[in-house]
Amino acid sequence: AFAVALADAQGGVEERAEKTAAVRDYCWAEIKKIIPNAILNGPQTWTPRVQGHVRVANNLNVSIPGLEAEMAVVSLDALGIAASTRSACTIGSDEPSHVIKALGVPRELAGTAIRLTLLPDATKSQARRIASALKETADRYRSKK
C-alpha cells in the first residue's frame, strides 16, 4: 500500500517541475525586460550544467545593483510578494549567504540578492506581477536616493 501511495505521489513530478521551471524562466525574462540591469544569480536553465548543478525548478535569485535586498523584501511583502534574502536556516546572520558566495556572486552584490520561490501552480500572470513589483520597488528606492 505504501509503495502504491509513493508511486502516486511521484506521478507527474517531472511534469510539474517542467511547468514551474517554464514559469520561472518567464518570470526572469519579464524581470530582465523591465529591469535591464537585473542579474540572475546562479546557473541559467538554458545553459549546460554549471559545475554539475542546474537551477531548482522553483528558484529564482536575482540582484538589482543599488537595491538593498532587505529593503526590497519589506517593500515586496507590502505588495503581496513573498521574498527573502537568504534561506531560513541562515536568517539573522550578518554574513552574506553561503549559497550566494558559493555561486560566485561578488561581495558587493551579495547584499542585493533577492530569493524568490515559486509555488508549483505559479502562473505567467503571477510572474508578471512579481516582475512589476520588483520594478516598482527598484524605482521607489531609486527616487529616495
Predicted regions and their residues:
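PLP-dependent enzyme catalytic core of the Aspartate aminotransferase-like
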Residues: E95-K145
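Generic non-transmembrane alpha-helical segments
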Residues: Y26, E30-I34, S75-I81, A131-R140
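Catalytic cores of large soluble enzymes that bind and process phosphate-bearing ligands
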Residues: G12, R16-K19, I91, A122, ...
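Short glycine/serine- and small hydrophobic-enriched flexible loop segments
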Residues: A3-G11
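Glycine-rich beta-alpha junction loops
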Residues: L6, C27, T47, I64-G66, ...
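Conserved C-terminal alpha-helix-loop-beta "cap" of PLP-dependent enzymes
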Residues: L60-I114
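Conserved PLP-dependent catalytic core of the aminotransferase class-I/II
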Residues: G11-S63, L67-A72
